[in-house]
Amino acid sequence: MPKGRQKVPRLDARLGLPICLCLELAIFFLVPQVMGLTEAGGLDTLGAGGLSWAVHLDSLEGERKEESLIQQANAVAQAAGLVNAGRIGELQGHYLFVQPAGHGQAMEAEAMRQQAEAVLAKHEAVRWHSEQRLLKRAKRSIHFNDPKYPQQWHLNNRRSPGRDINVTGVWERNVTGRGVTVVVVDDGVEHTVQDIAPNYSPEGSYDLNSNDPDPMPHPDEENGNHHGTRCAGEIAAVPNNSFCAVGVAYGSRIAGIRVLDGPLTDSMEAVAFNKHYQINDIYSCSWGPDDDGKTVDGPHQLGKAALQHGVMAGRQGFGSIFVVASGNGGQHNDNCNYDGYANSIYTVTIGAVDEEGRMPFYAEECASMLAVTFSGGDKMLRSIVTTDWDLQKGTGCTEGHTGTSAAAPLAAGMIALMLQVRPCLTWRDVQHIIVFTATQYEDHRADWLTNEAGFSHSHQHGFGLLNAWRLVNAAKIWTSVPYLASYVSPMLKENKAVPRSPHSLEVLWNVSRTDLEMSGLKTLEHVAVTVSITHPRRGSLELKLFCPSGMMSLIGAPRSMDSDPNGFNDWTFSTVRCWGERARGVYRLVIRDVGDEPLQVGILQQWQLTLYGSTWSPVDIKDRQSLLESAMSGKYLHDDFTLPCPPGLKIPEEDGYSITPNTLKTLVLVGCFSVFWTIYYMLEVCLSQRSKASTHGCRRGCCPWPPQSQNSKEVGTALESMPLCSSKDLDGVDSEHGDCTTASSLLAPELLGEADWSLSQNSKSDLDCPPHQPPDLKDGQIC
């Protein structure tokens, strides 16, 4: 064999392959560990029981500062019998020294600890050092001792994770609705129930049915006046009291306005919508017109005015938040566009989905629905667990709350969480945040369409399912939208026939740039159409509105049970499906008769288009969408981050004040006391004057002058004629005619009325009293 060459073993030799495999495996496992020691991530490769020290070295000067520090750290670690595991995170000059492998015995470890401590304590390059100990940390989670909380799947669904409102993470960050008051406008709230009593707000409550401050529900024959109490429990039921359940905003205050347990008028509704509107922030209204599939109704003139006034003046000018349920007429083919409360631009219209995310049998659909949240569904699915009244057959807790009546309070509670982190959200800010953060939920019945601005909407689910985490994180960084801009078209006279399907009537209106210049309206929020249509069967009409982008809204759905022969008289339909789209362009209203009966043809008499929106441009909307998505990690959801809030307006609580019975009783008592004191004072004055007159009577022919009644003298009224002195009282004075001297005869003519002066002269004449000179008088006296 030539010198200098060695025999290399072949890979297929008997032991060659196993050796190579072992080497490769060793490299695979050991290299990452060795490399990991040079990074902060290498700390995870150390045994839990290994020794380690955090060491802060004195900083060095020079261009190669970092390299010098690493060399110094290696030297110090070696001197201490340790290994430099690398810099700790991004902290300059901070390094982790760890125990070398192979010193796992207790005695060896203790000896190494003492050696390391001695070296590090005396080394001149070490500024600070600390042996690392295992720290005990626990994930922050919410635990309640309320017995029914595990059954509140809508708050924390353990059976089907993700099918809930995603609120526990918000609670963990101490966002519970603190500082916010929600009022339930309903049939009363039993505020003495232990789940509600600690959070009850008497200042925000009132009973409009009995006209007193206490909204306590009254027992009824049907045992049905528990509705408001159940809704209140959903919002603010107190946690950790070992009773029933927990509210979604359990740190908020809850008030009640009792108005549905008796006759209801337009004026009562108006009072309810604005009652204590500087105390109450959110009005939860789980009621509306009959859900019978044939009613077209809503707030009347005063109710509409109160809603508008509430969003303008309520909550110190930021606007009251009105949350309304979309309705439970689904089994009657009803539609919430025929409900004026759900149709209003001033309300947050909330629908329902069941535990599986499907539209329940009772739920209504409409183009004005903003969002949905959870409620009960079919009998096989769970309903909402909440507080109940304990009157009559109630136990204080129920597992059977359902309907959109149960969905609206959940939305109100989530809005309370939003207002805690951002109290200055306006009523339109709340609507915008819902639109921007609601999540699309799969349902085969949902007709999801994405509009020009990128928002997806369905007539069944609105913009989607409310998510408390997304709502609160968005609210935390939200800056207010621009002012509300609007455009109203002229009243468009048509008088055109409505043909039967498949034909249709189509009318157009073009909104130009010039039309929008004055208001500055650029992008849409709500679009409203007011129509007057005659038709022998109202339920056979179908109305669709197309925005300039082509987005279709079914604003008037056919209803099989609506046989009203009067059609529509200035009824306003609205849609939110064009939210964020450009306002300028051609709007198309398409109407057709889908009935199968040979009836008289309907007539579109007139219609009017109203646009609501803001000066935001499409680019502004895109930027806001991006900003909100960046906040969904929760990085801003802490107390150290707060955007400044503008001060609210100082608005009086109410223009008028309803006098309560207790106040009236107090006023009556005060009035009676005032009358008594007045009479007493008058008697006292009268008696004192008589006593004075008897004490200071005519002495030596002289009497006090002038008389006590100065008012009579000043205004020139006649004084009653009365003798000033008798002949017996005069001392050294001619008294021949003294008994006929009267006050009226002694007064100057200018102090008497004409009749009194004549009377004075006549009485002198009748008595034939000759004039005589008065005696010498002291000042202020006559005789």
Curated annotation (Swiss-Prot):
Class of this enzyme: hydrolase
Transmembrane domains' residue ranges: 667-687
Taxonomy of the source species: Eukaryota, Metazoa, Chordata, Craniata, Vertebrata
Sequence ranges of Basic and acidic residues compositional bias: 215-225, 765-783
Entry protein name: Proprotein convertase subtilisin/kexin type 7
Tissue expression profile of the protein: Widely expressed. Highly expressed in colon and spleen.
Membrane topology, from the record: Single-pass type I membrane protein
Region (Disordered): 195-228, 761-783
Signal peptide positions (record): 1-36
Site, as annotated: Cleavage: 140-141
Record domain P/Homo B: where: 480-617
EC numbers on record: 3.4.21.-
UniProt gene name: Pcsk7
CDD domains for the chain: Peptidases_S8_Protein_convertases_Kexins_Furin-like (cd04059)
Requisite cofactors: Ca(2+)
Single biological process term from Gene Ontology: protein processing
